[in-house]
Amino acid sequence: GDFSRLLVGPLRFSVWGMSGTLHVADDQWTSHAEAALWQWIERADAAVNRFNPESEISRLNRDGELTDASEDFFRFLDAARYAYDMTEGLCDPTVANALCAWGYASDFDHIPDGVVVQSTRPTHGMGALEVTVAERYLTTCCPLDFGASAKALVVDLIAAEVSRHSDVLVEIGGDVAVSTTHGSSPWIIGVAPDGPEPTAPQIAVLSGGVATSSTTLRTWATDRGPAHHIIDPRTN
């Protein structure tokens, strides 16, 4: 395979308490790709970052309703609903209460040591959300968290925009999106629990996405032992 792309000026960045990577095969489109990257990150932050008190999802969670929801919010809502349906409810945006009960109530970098786990309520599923699309009005009976699907959508959107000009790889927090033109070599993605490893398993991908997020890095201590950010909605 052609590994050269991984050596040509990748941009490494941090956002939402996670690391990220942007590789652009054609250097002349690097500035365009960086602009697209930060534009979509800012749009996602304004729409669905529950740690941003001014975001639309924070307003919805705080007030139980959201009026005049943006097109971006509906875009992320559609992605969350799609993930919910595809996983038969295992990827459930109504686990926000459970995440908070286990200590993930603030951005990962600010989770305190020794969290005391609170009691949790059953998740509600997508039925918790009522949407009037024509009026862009939503109500919810419980807090929502689109984190499981939002950053995956962000990397997909960035890759789709940049792919009109260059082969590209975008990664945020282990969610990877790639695109290549006809005849190009695939992107080679290494998957390792604790960062780059020479002997890590590798996946060759021409176009599409790979989810590599796990429970090994984003962990914290609680009175019930180590906790992580992946919640099973059947048990909380």
Predicted regions and their residues:
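Mature catalytic core of soluble alpha/beta enzymes
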Residues: G1-T235
